[in-house]
Amino acid sequence: MKPPILITIMLTVVSGTMIVLTSSHWLTVWIGFEMNMLAIIPILMKKSNPRAIEASTKYLLTQATASMILMMGVAIDLLYSGQWTMSKTLCPMASAMMTIALAMKLGLAPFHFWVPEVTQGIHMSSGLILLTWQKIAPLSILYQISPTINPNLLLPMAIASVLIGGWGGLNQTQLRKILAYSSIAHMGWMAAITLYNPTMMILNLTIYIIMTSTTFMLFMYNSSTTTLSLSQTWNKAPLITSLILMLMLSLGGLPPLSGFIPKWMIIQELTKNEMIIVPTLLAMTALLNLYFYMRLTYTTTLTMFPSTNNMMMKWKFNNTKKMTLLSPLIVVSTMLLPITPLLSILD
């Protein structure tokens, strides 16, 4: 893809998300979603092959269906309230339809089936955008309608997402699918806290985007797509191996790394709201995610396949320009826990 075309498409993707973030009118929200969806399709098809075309088609059909359900909910609310502007007094039917539509866009269970398939069929860089930037717009709308959401609808989807995100990643060897199931699980955590402290959901989203972006960038730098290729990283770049180990444990939410912050604060907030069963289930199902992250770290660091590489190990990177952005991202992805007391403003 030529640079001017790519820049135009990326600007359209960003503009669509910004329109959704800044809108208080349902029609402009829908326009922003459609701009974003139509612009992301060429990015998903950047590597033109049958798998990418199939993945783009699945994404298009899913997002178009979700937009249709969202507009049906908006139409019902229009009949109920007589206005197009967002309000905190949605009728129950409109709120339920909007929640289902946003769950489809985010890939929450039971509407999660498209996430692993689409992520596996596209390039790593496209997967990075799909699993990070594309979550911002739907979560912003979920944030705005959170006072009207029925907990009996969203909480089961959140728990199921964390459970499926853990189970689905257990038998995977493809790194993109593992990150896709990780995304489903993280979306479940965000959906669970949206009902009780939407601001904490923004914190969770920020940390998730930083950690996932760093992981994708390390995989792209190392040209790793499977656990087998990841296990051979030690022969090429021991430093990357160590960084991947830390990032995997952080994504799994293991203290004292950054990924522990959102899980800790979400469980604490749910407990404050006299929810005992939900945080217990979330904490138990998070062990599934931690297991396959631990398996990845074991594959990366503690197993060494036979290698005929007689060259010296690359303790220094040849092209440091690519690593410039990674340095601060890795620090933030792993070492944020000491600043947790400063986050008391979210209470």
From Swiss-Prot:
Question: Which domain of life does this protein belong to?
Answer: Eukaryota
Reactions catalysed:
a ubiquinone + NADH + 5 H(+)(in) = a ubiquinol + NAD(+) + 4 H(+)(out)
The terms describing its cellular component in GO are: mitochondrial inner membrane
Major site of localization recorded for this protein: mitochondrion
Q: How does it sit in the membrane?
A: Multi-pass membrane protein
* Membrane spanning residue stretches: 3-23, 25-45, 59-79, 96-116, 122-142, 149-169, 178-198, 200-220, 237-257, 274-294, 325-345
Q: What is its EC number?
A: 7.1.1.2
Q: What class of enzyme is it?
A: translocase
Q: Where in the cell is it found?
A: Mitochondrion inner membrane
Which GO-annotated molecular functions does the record name? NADH dehydrogenase (ubiquinone) activity
Gene Ontology process terms (BP): mitochondrial electron transport, NADH to ubiquinone; mitochondrial respiratory chain complex I assembly
Keywords for the protein's UniProt record, in alphabetical order: Electron transport, Membrane, Mitochondrion, Mitochondrion inner membrane, NAD, Respiratory chain, Translocase, Transmembrane, Transmembrane helix, Transport, Ubiquinone
What family is this? Belongs to the complex I subunit 2 family.
Q: Its biological function?
A: Core subunit of the mitochondrial membrane respiratory chain NADH dehydrogenase (Complex I) which catalyzes electron transfer from NADH through the respiratory chain, using ubiquinone as an electron acceptor. Essential for the catalytic activity and assembly of complex I.
Assembly: Core subunit of respiratory chain NADH dehydrogenase (Complex I) which is composed of 45 different subunits. Interacts with TMEM242.
The cross-references to PANTHER family, in alphabetical order and at most eight, read: NADH-UBIQUINONE OXIDOREDUCTASE CHAIN 2
Q: What is this protein called?
A: NADH-ubiquinone oxidoreductase chain 2
Which species expresses this protein natively?
Answer: Cynictis penicillata
